[in-house]
Amino acid sequence: METVNRAFFDNYLDAWNAHDSAAVARHMADDAIYEDVALGRVLHGPSEMASFVEEATRSSSDFRFEEVSLFTAGTDYANEWVMVGTNDREVRGVPPTGRSFRVRGASIGKLDASGRIAENRDYYNLSELLMQLGISPPAPSS
């Protein structure tokens, strides 16, 4: 069984920071499950992951992750990061706010036997992100 290694995560974050959706997708197992808990989205496999990366980086030319720490135990990992960028591009007809964001978060996951991401859950404060962008968070549901 493969264990988590530093180079794998350096390459993974480099791919995100280069907005290289295909390279990010290559880090995912064919049957990977990637969950963005804040958005309530669950992605399946490399193809959906590539589309997600394109969507996530579309509104920010300088979107990137800054790693804070990486903890590993066998094939399990916890990666603390800061998501940084500027909302400087129009998306789906919505004009950019021009505001920057800096939001702390973490990824918790597991690699498969081939050393690719089998499971990943991202946690961050969506309300904090929306407030920094000058966008009101959605009203609580009843």
Predicted regions and their residues:
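C-terminal and inter-domain tail/linker signature
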Residues: 1-142
